[in-house]
């Protein structure tokens, strides 16, 4: 279908958008105003780690009812769409070509499945080829349709940073997955974090920020120690003033390993816990 700004189906999220397209072509649906949405973008030539994290974040967000927006490119975009579908959620692909063209062809399955559980969206008419100049343009629509933008992996001059810039101009929150210093695929994300982007440590963290699903700081009736209200307090209480090995902290906290590690990292960043040597922690005095 074709919709214009005068159409009642036109996304309110696009109102006031700088360079608003004169129309949109849609196969399937567009996000409604009540729908919580996250854009997950990143490198086409991503690492195995990037693929895994894009899929993981998208799947968990989708399971919690958050729809995933991306660009159906190879790499991070494709894995984000696939993760959302695997999580039983909705996903939307903003294309840099006409609706009648599947680009890249390797994503044919996504091209066919996404309209059944979301939609394909483009400002380019049928027959429009996937020209290089189209992709930076479509990025402004990706960010505009999202409540929050997550960059998973990006080089220093990645197109994903264009999406992040658009998001900031539009007043959206931007988060990035941290990576190893010196890793080319992490330079863009680490740069965003250095410039003030949020640190994406887990899907649960982003769900809490978006007010969707169970957040990190919600209390858990099963995992309480001395009446502690949150998992964060629980983990902190398991760290002593003397060095303590990780396996002992895990045993006492009785939380999933990845959750405990995530909270320990947060506590380190806050200056409340030190990793005195590998897998050994103590409270900072």
Q: Which residues are covered by each model-predicted region?
A:
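Glycine-biased, small-residue-rich flexible motifs in mid-sequence functional cores and linkers
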Residues: 2-285
């Amino acid at each position: 279908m074709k919709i214009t700004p005068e159409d009642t189906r036109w996304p309110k999220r696009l109102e006031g958008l700088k360079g608003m397209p004169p129309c949109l072509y849609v196969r399937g649906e567009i996000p409604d105003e009540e729908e919580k949405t996250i854009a997950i973008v990143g490198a086409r030539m991503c690492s195995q780690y990037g693929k895994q994290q894009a899929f993981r974040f998208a799947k968990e967000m989708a399971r919690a009812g958050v729809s995933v927006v991306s660009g159906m490119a190879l790499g991070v975009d494709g894995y984000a769409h696939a993760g959302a579908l695997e999580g039983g959620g909705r996903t939307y692909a903003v294309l840099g070509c006409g609706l009648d063209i599947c680009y890249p062809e390797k994503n044919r399955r996504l091209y066919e499945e996404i309209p059944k559980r979301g939609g394909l969206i483009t400002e380019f008419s049928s027959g429009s080829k996937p020209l290089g100049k189209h992709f930076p343009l479509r990025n402004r629509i990706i960010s505009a349709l999202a409540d929050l933008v997550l960059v998973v992996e990006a080089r220093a001059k990645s197109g994903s940073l264009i999406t992040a810039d658009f998001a900031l101009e539009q007043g959206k929150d931007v988060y990035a997955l941290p990576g190893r210093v010196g890793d080319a695929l992490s330079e863009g994300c680490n740069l965003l974090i250095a410039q003030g982007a949020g640190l994406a440590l887990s899907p649960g963290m982003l769900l809490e920020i978006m007010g969707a699903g169970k957040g990190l700081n919600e209390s858990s009736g099963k995992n309480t120690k001395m009446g502690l209200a949150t998992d964060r307090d629980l983990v902190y209480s398991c760290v002593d003033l003397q060095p303590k090995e990780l396996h002992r902290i895990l045993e006492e906290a009785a939380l999933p390993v990845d959750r405990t590690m995530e909270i320990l990292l947060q506590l380190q960043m806050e200056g409340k816990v030190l990793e005195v040597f590998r897998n050994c922690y103590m409270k900072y005095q």
